[in-house]
Amino acid sequence: MAPQRSQDKTPIQLLHEYGIKISSAPKYELIHADGDAHQPSFMFSVTIGEVTCKGRGSTKKAAKHEAAEAALKLLKRDSQIIDQRDNNGLSPEAGEASNPVGILQELAMQRVWCLPEYVVFMETGPGHMKEFTIACRLEGLEETGSGSSKKLARRAAAENMIAKLQSLSGSSEITWSPPSRVYVESLRNSTGEKVSLLKRTPLSLPNTDYIQMLLEISLELGFQVTYIDIDELTVNGQYQCLVELSTRPVTVCHGSGVTSSNAHNAAAHNALQYIKMVASKH
């Protein structure tokens, strides 16, 4: 089956949705870039399944659109068109607006999520050829988008976030839900077995696997644990990292050690000390 070309979706969006349905995501590749600074020209190829098409444009996004458009035409010619007016799981009005930023905002409000946050991630190029990269953050997810203006970059980031949500949902209808929210204050009232054990356990015992201990507590309470390695060594030449707990507010603790693994264990130890302190308060 081939994707329906509806007026409220871009060729890139339609091809992405079709890729989800056939379990083969479109892959874009920059073939070459030429021209001068005032008239650049880019050529991209897109491959989906056994189909490969090319597109040319004055921007990378335009070239990708042309490639996706060519792939859609080829798929349409070879297959019967299936109507896809699902509007990303939102109301018809939201889909028809073709405004990714507005669609994402409405989705967050409907699901009672935190509203999307947009942060300028990078700014490159001379004054007349600026390119902005903006990160869109939503419920623990992050996607970036680029454009010749902040508005276009923000739109691209929102578009990519919607595509990410569709991918996590396994279809063009967004059914994904963020992990349950665990508020730091709620730790005081926890009666879980692992938390109760933590309250009674000294955190100064040698050769303790604090990483495993933190994992068990996170599974009991329902928050996620993410370790972030820091490239720079400490002044003493030790590895260092951060551990982030998806609590509300987010909890971040630092750790360092003679190896990366030791740094992770130290960060987990510090996070456990914090959890123990909060859980023991009355």
UniProtKB/Swiss-Prot annotation:
Its main location: cytoplasm. Homodimer. Interacts with dicer1 and eif2ak2/pkr. Also able to interact with dsRNA. It comes from the Eukaryota. Residues 10-77, 99-167, 209-277 form the DRBM domain. Keywords: Cytoplasm, Repeat, RNA-binding, RNA-mediated gene silencing. InterPro entries: dsRBD_dom (IPR014720), Ig-like_dom (IPR007110), RLC_Component (IPR051247), Staufen_C (IPR032478). Pfam families: dsrm, Staufen_C. Activates eif2ak2/pkr in the absence of double-stranded RNA (dsRNA), leading to phosphorylation of eif2s1/efi2-alpha and inhibition of translation and induction of apoptosis. Required for siRNA production by dicer1 and for subsequent siRNA-mediated post-transcriptional gene silencing. Does not seem to be required for processing of pre-miRNA to miRNA by dicer1. One of its GO terms (molecular function) is double-stranded RNA binding. GO terms for cellular component: cytoplasm; nucleus; perinuclear region of cytoplasm; RISC complex; RISC-loading complex. The keyword Transcription regulation does not apply. It is found in: Cytoplasm, Perinuclear region. This is Interferon-inducible double-stranded RNA-dependent protein kinase activator A homolog. Belongs to the PRKRA family. The gene is prkra. GO terms for biological process: regulation of regulatory ncRNA processing; siRNA processing.
